[in-house]
Amino acid sequence: MESGSVNDQFTYITLGLFGFYIIYEGLRGRYRDGRKTLKDWQIFGISFAWLQFVERPMLIVCSYFTYRTLMPGLEGNYGHWQDAYLVPLIVAFILIDELLHGSVHYFAHAKRAKNKWLAVIQRWYKGAHRLHHTNGGPDGKGQIGASQTIVVSWGWPFSLPNYWFGTFCLYLGLWEVWIWGTSMKSLWGIHNHANLTYDMTLLKHRSPLISKTMYALCHVFVFPNQHHHHHSRSSNSGKNFQNFIALYDWLLWKKLVISTERPAVYGWRKSEAEETSVLYRFFHRPFMDKWKLGFFKP
């Protein structure tokens, strides 16, 4: 099957599932009573438009010319690997992609780096990631749903190393590996943000075999309630950094949290400017606190 047709099929599947979850959440009343505000929908629209029409094309163009300049001899030379090793390559792609993403995600949530230059980079990631955690109104009733998957402020996707890893795979000619790997991760990420509760039901199942099996699976894969706790306004916001492979949260970051209850409150507290303007919330970036980072003496 041609890579283009495979990509089209996964695009339709992803958009279809995305739309299904949004409609499902609406029918279940997940957007009522302050759970989702007008500003949340506005932010979703801005994020979607910016990602699709500005940032993603810019990433593809910039990464392609970077690779072509630095590694001109590698362009398209490894596509034949897919004929013999497609499944192992997809597994390797997902594991590497998840590790790169989890590393930066962990860095964005960590305490301020002691090295002042690392602190500047970290401040960028913290600011770029903040929008993904600011939802709902000031009443604390806001909840996340499938639409939150794509809520990211400018610069976050462009500066993620796993996105550059993906375009590098494309440059090498590993189209099918990239299509399958990114599609599987996207579908799983949408499912993790959606208001699904099956994982909590299985964790509380009366059968020990079912509950313990689900508990074990939560150490391998990320399920909705694990990611919902990452979006909570609690200490769990600094837990569960992965989108797909929970093994890294468990064995590498030591930040795995498994709960049978939903978070009490979602989202980070917002400043008055963030509460007032969706454009400020999307575009504002405190690049550098010069005094605290030690570049200048007061």
Residue ranges and their predicted role:
Residues 1-18:
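Hydrophobic transmembrane alpha-helical segments in integral membrane proteins
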Residues 173, 177, 259-298:
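A membrane-cytosol interface segment of integral membrane proteins
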Residues 49-90:
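Long, highly hydrophobic alpha-helical transmembrane signal-anchor segments
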Residues 9-14, 40, 44, 82-90, ...:
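Residue-level signature of transmembrane alpha-helical entry/exit and packing/kink sites
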Residues 46-60, 146-159:
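Select subsegments of transmembrane alpha-helices in polytopic membrane proteins
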